Amino acid sequence: MKKFLSLTVLGVSLVSLAACGNSSSKTETKGSLDNEASKVLTVKHGNVRQNFDKIIMANASQEFSGGLNLDSLKGLVCEPTSTSHEQAGDATLDVYNWQYDNVVVTAKLFNNSTVVKSISTFSYVRDSKITLKMYEDLKNGTSYDNAVKTLGVPDVYSIAVSSDATMTQALWSSNLVTKKGKTGSLTLNFKNGTLENKSQENLINK
Protein backbone atom coordinates (compact mmCIF):
# COMPACT_ATOMS: atom_id res chain seq x y z
CA MET A 1 0.00 0.00 0.00
CA LYS A 2 2.35 2.66 -1.31
CA LYS A 3 2.33 5.93 0.61
CA PHE A 4 -1.26 5.37 1.70
CA LEU A 5 -0.78 7.82 4.53
CA SER A 6 0.82 11.10 3.56
CA LEU A 7 2.71 13.14 6.12
CA THR A 8 0.04 15.84 5.94
CA VAL A 9 -2.33 13.44 7.71
CA LEU A 10 -0.78 14.62 10.97
CA GLY A 11 -3.87 16.73 10.56
CA VAL A 12 -4.78 18.14 13.97
CA SER A 13 -2.68 21.24 14.44
CA LEU A 14 -0.89 21.65 17.74
CA VAL A 15 -0.19 25.34 17.19
CA SER A 16 -3.44 26.34 18.87
CA LEU A 17 -1.99 25.32 22.21
CA ALA A 18 0.59 28.09 22.05
CA ALA A 19 -1.94 30.68 23.15
CA CYS A 20 -3.61 28.61 25.84
CA GLY A 21 -0.90 28.89 28.48
CA ASN A 22 -2.16 28.03 31.95
CA SER A 23 -5.78 28.94 31.33
CA SER A 24 -7.42 25.83 32.75
CA SER A 25 -7.69 24.93 36.42
CA LYS A 26 -4.84 22.68 37.55
CA THR A 27 -3.10 21.51 40.69
CA GLU A 28 0.60 22.22 40.61
CA THR A 29 3.21 19.53 41.23
CA LYS A 30 6.81 20.67 41.09
CA GLY A 31 9.78 18.55 40.12
CA SER A 32 13.17 18.85 38.51
CA LEU A 33 13.44 18.93 34.74
CA ASP A 34 15.42 15.69 34.79
CA ASN A 35 12.66 13.63 36.37
CA GLU A 36 9.59 15.27 34.81
CA ALA A 37 9.51 12.61 32.09
CA SER A 38 8.76 9.95 34.70
CA LYS A 39 6.71 12.02 37.17
CA VAL A 40 2.93 11.87 37.24
CA LEU A 41 1.84 15.52 37.33
CA THR A 42 -1.60 16.21 38.77
CA VAL A 43 -3.37 18.47 36.30
CA LYS A 44 -6.87 18.83 34.97
CA HIS A 45 -7.50 15.91 32.58
CA GLY A 46 -4.07 14.53 33.47
CA ASN A 47 -5.54 11.02 33.31
CA VAL A 48 -6.56 11.67 29.71
CA ARG A 49 -2.98 12.72 28.91
CA GLN A 50 -1.63 9.58 30.59
CA ASN A 51 -4.03 7.29 28.73
CA PHE A 52 -3.17 9.02 25.46
CA ASP A 53 0.45 7.94 25.99
CA LYS A 54 -0.75 4.32 26.16
CA ILE A 55 -2.25 4.34 22.66
CA ILE A 56 -0.09 1.89 20.68
CA MET A 57 0.66 2.76 17.06
CA ALA A 58 0.46 0.49 14.02
CA ASN A 59 3.54 -1.10 12.48
CA ALA A 60 4.03 0.00 8.87
CA SER A 61 6.23 -3.02 8.09
CA GLN A 62 3.38 -5.35 9.07
CA GLU A 63 0.72 -3.86 6.80
CA PHE A 64 -0.15 -1.30 9.49
CA SER A 65 -1.34 -3.91 11.97
CA GLY A 66 -0.63 -3.88 15.70
CA GLY A 67 -2.09 -0.48 16.52
CA LEU A 68 -4.71 -0.14 19.23
CA ASN A 69 -8.18 -1.09 17.95
CA LEU A 70 -11.41 0.78 18.61
CA ASP A 71 -12.57 -1.41 21.49
CA SER A 72 -9.23 -0.94 23.26
CA LEU A 73 -9.39 2.82 22.63
CA LYS A 74 -12.83 2.91 24.23
CA GLY A 75 -11.35 1.12 27.23
CA LEU A 76 -8.77 3.89 27.59
CA VAL A 77 -10.69 7.03 26.67
CA CYS A 78 -14.37 5.94 26.68
CA GLU A 79 -16.87 6.35 23.85
CA PRO A 80 -15.80 8.81 21.14
CA THR A 81 -17.49 12.18 21.01
CA SER A 82 -17.59 12.15 17.20
CA THR A 83 -16.66 9.89 14.30
CA SER A 84 -15.94 10.49 10.63
CA HIS A 85 -14.00 9.11 7.67
CA GLU A 86 -10.99 10.51 5.86
CA GLN A 87 -9.22 9.59 2.63
CA ALA A 88 -5.46 9.08 2.85
CA GLY A 89 -4.19 8.21 -0.59
CA ASP A 90 -5.86 4.96 -1.59
CA ALA A 91 -7.01 4.17 1.94
CA THR A 92 -9.98 5.24 4.04
CA LEU A 93 -9.30 6.06 7.67
CA ASP A 94 -11.85 5.94 10.47
CA VAL A 95 -11.45 9.10 12.55
CA TYR A 96 -12.51 9.26 16.20
CA ASN A 97 -12.47 12.32 18.46
CA TRP A 98 -12.79 12.53 22.23
CA GLN A 99 -13.37 15.93 23.84
CA TYR A 100 -12.83 16.76 27.52
CA ASP A 101 -13.60 20.47 27.97
CA ASN A 102 -11.00 22.05 25.64
CA VAL A 103 -8.77 18.97 25.46
CA VAL A 104 -9.25 16.95 22.27
CA VAL A 105 -7.87 13.48 21.56
CA THR A 106 -7.96 12.20 17.99
CA ALA A 107 -7.21 8.71 16.69
CA LYS A 108 -7.25 7.66 13.04
CA LEU A 109 -7.55 3.94 12.33
CA PHE A 110 -6.84 1.87 9.24
CA ASN A 111 -8.34 -1.63 9.29
CA ASN A 112 -9.11 -1.08 13.00
CA SER A 113 -5.48 -0.26 13.83
CA THR A 114 -4.32 3.17 15.04
CA VAL A 115 -2.07 4.91 12.50
CA VAL A 116 -2.44 8.50 13.76
CA LYS A 117 -2.94 9.86 17.27
CA SER A 118 -2.94 13.44 18.52
CA ILE A 119 -3.86 15.43 21.60
CA SER A 120 -4.37 19.19 21.61
CA THR A 121 -5.07 22.06 24.03
CA PHE A 122 -3.61 20.33 27.09
CA SER A 123 -0.90 21.81 29.28
CA TYR A 124 0.87 20.86 32.47
CA VAL A 125 1.60 23.18 35.38
CA ARG A 126 5.33 23.26 36.08
CA ASP A 127 8.20 25.64 36.65
CA SER A 128 9.53 27.72 33.74
CA LYS A 129 12.88 26.11 32.91
CA ILE A 130 13.31 25.84 29.13
CA THR A 131 15.47 28.73 27.91
CA LEU A 132 16.37 30.01 24.47
CA LYS A 133 19.85 28.52 24.87
CA MET A 134 18.40 25.08 25.60
CA TYR A 135 16.37 25.40 22.42
CA GLU A 136 19.38 26.51 20.40
CA ASP A 137 21.42 23.59 21.73
CA LEU A 138 18.95 21.08 20.26
CA LYS A 139 20.52 19.87 17.03
CA ASN A 140 18.97 18.03 14.12
CA GLY A 141 19.49 14.32 14.65
CA THR A 142 18.74 14.50 18.38
CA SER A 143 16.56 11.56 19.42
CA TYR A 144 13.07 12.08 20.78
CA ASP A 145 14.06 10.37 24.04
CA ASN A 146 17.04 12.69 24.53
CA ALA A 147 14.89 15.74 23.79
CA VAL A 148 12.46 14.63 26.49
CA LYS A 149 15.32 14.11 28.94
CA THR A 150 16.40 17.69 28.30
CA LEU A 151 13.04 19.45 28.09
CA GLY A 152 10.65 17.23 30.02
CA VAL A 153 7.61 15.61 28.42
CA PRO A 154 5.79 17.70 25.79
CA ASP A 155 2.43 19.17 26.67
CA VAL A 156 0.88 17.81 23.49
CA TYR A 157 2.09 15.74 20.57
CA SER A 158 0.94 13.77 17.56
CA ILE A 159 2.28 10.68 15.81
CA ALA A 160 1.49 9.53 12.26
CA VAL A 161 2.65 6.22 10.79
CA SER A 162 3.00 6.10 7.01
CA SER A 163 4.72 3.82 4.54
CA ASP A 164 7.46 6.47 4.30
CA ALA A 165 8.20 7.17 7.96
CA THR A 166 6.84 7.68 11.45
CA MET A 167 6.44 11.39 12.07
CA THR A 168 6.12 12.92 15.53
CA GLN A 169 5.30 16.55 16.26
CA ALA A 170 5.75 17.62 19.90
CA LEU A 171 4.95 20.97 21.48
CA TRP A 172 5.99 22.45 24.83
CA SER A 173 4.13 25.43 26.30
CA SER A 174 3.96 25.15 30.09
CA ASN A 175 7.60 25.15 31.23
CA LEU A 176 9.13 27.87 29.06
CA VAL A 177 11.12 30.96 30.02
CA THR A 178 9.43 33.66 27.93
CA LYS A 179 9.26 37.39 27.45
CA LYS A 180 7.26 39.11 30.18
CA GLY A 181 3.57 38.99 29.41
CA LYS A 182 4.09 36.74 26.39
CA THR A 183 2.97 33.17 25.79
CA GLY A 184 5.65 30.97 24.26
CA SER A 185 5.88 27.70 22.42
CA LEU A 186 8.55 25.24 21.36
CA THR A 187 7.79 22.78 18.57
CA LEU A 188 9.96 19.85 17.51
CA ASN A 189 9.34 17.66 14.46
CA PHE A 190 10.83 14.17 14.41
CA LYS A 191 11.17 11.68 11.58
CA ASN A 192 11.62 8.08 12.70
CA GLY A 193 12.50 9.30 16.18
CA THR A 194 15.18 11.85 15.24
CA LEU A 195 14.83 15.64 15.17
CA GLU A 196 14.28 17.02 11.67
CA ASN A 197 13.35 20.66 12.37
CA LYS A 198 12.28 22.96 15.19
CA SER A 199 10.65 26.32 15.91
CA GLN A 200 9.94 28.54 18.90
CA GLU A 201 8.14 31.70 19.89
CA ASN A 202 9.09 34.20 22.60
CA LEU A 203 11.76 32.13 24.36
CA ILE A 204 14.44 34.06 26.25
CA ASN A 205 17.36 33.24 28.53
CA LYS A 206 17.13 33.72 32.29
Please annotate each region the language model reported.
Residues 6-14:
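Hydrophobic helical h-region of N-terminal Sec-dependent signal peptides
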